[in-house]
């Protein structure tokens, strides 16, 4: 055996012995959240910018009274007769059901029969979070606001407060591991703009698998 070959084999043996030792591998310093973008100095403006870029329509308003007026304005603009309305502490406090009925609209709850859900012209809901980085709406599944509320009507109107904005998706996953009752959500929906598909002849089509229009009314207070 030549000296060169013997030296090579000895180095291989040493490397194998070192590799088998616990803790012999070099530790890599943590690099934090790679790709974290955040929201900059104005999370609300950042969200509206990104949401609009994704094809949504943002409507910043000063208070809840103006938010209600904006919902009625949009419903009137779409000539929507049947409204699918979510529920929850935030939405219920707005008194939208009564205002919509006074405007002559038929209002259904999310637990309505299947045929009723498909007949809705507009879906109105709250949100759990808004992600400034991507302009996304986040919904945690619950009986009062199921997926059908934001999926079936051709137009979706979401009402939110600026306090629900989080900077980045990394922040969302830190927050959404459990619900208030201590259990993880059965489903998490992250919606960025209206429904889009481009798998037919490579042409972008909107509104095939969900709402063709999505509006966010963002309350400053």
Regions picked out by a protein language model, each given a short descriptive name:
Residues 1-221:
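The feature marks the mature, well-folded catalytic cores of soluble enzymes
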């Amino acid at each position: 055996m030549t000296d060169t070959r013997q030296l090579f084999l000895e180095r291989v043996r040493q490397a194998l012995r070192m590799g088998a030792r616990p803790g012999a591998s070099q530790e890599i310093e943590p690099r934090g959240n790679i790709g974290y973008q955040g929201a900059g100095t104005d999370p609300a403006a950042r969200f509206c910018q990104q949401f609009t870029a994704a094809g949504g329509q943002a409507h910043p308003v000063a208070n809840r009274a103006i938010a209600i007026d904006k919902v009625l304005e949009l419903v009137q603009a779409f000539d929507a007769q049947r409204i699918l309305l979510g529920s929850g502490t935030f939405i219920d406090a707005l008194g939208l059901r009564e205002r919509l009925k006074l405007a002559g609209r038929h209002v259904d709850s999310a637990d309505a029969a299947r045929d009723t859900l498909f007949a809705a012209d507009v879906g109105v809901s709250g949100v759990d979070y808004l992600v400034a980085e991507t302009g996304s709406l986040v919904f945690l599944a619950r009986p009062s606001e199921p997926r059908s509320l934001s999926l079936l009507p051709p137009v979706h109107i979401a009402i939110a407060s600026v306090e629900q904005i989080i900077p980045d998706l990394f922040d969302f996953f830190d927050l959404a591991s459990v619900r208030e009752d201590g259990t993880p959500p059965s489903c998490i929906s992250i919606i960025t703009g209206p429904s889009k598909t481009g798998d037919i002849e490579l042409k972008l089509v909107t509104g095939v698998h969900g709402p063709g229009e999505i509006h966010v009314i963002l309350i400053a207070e």
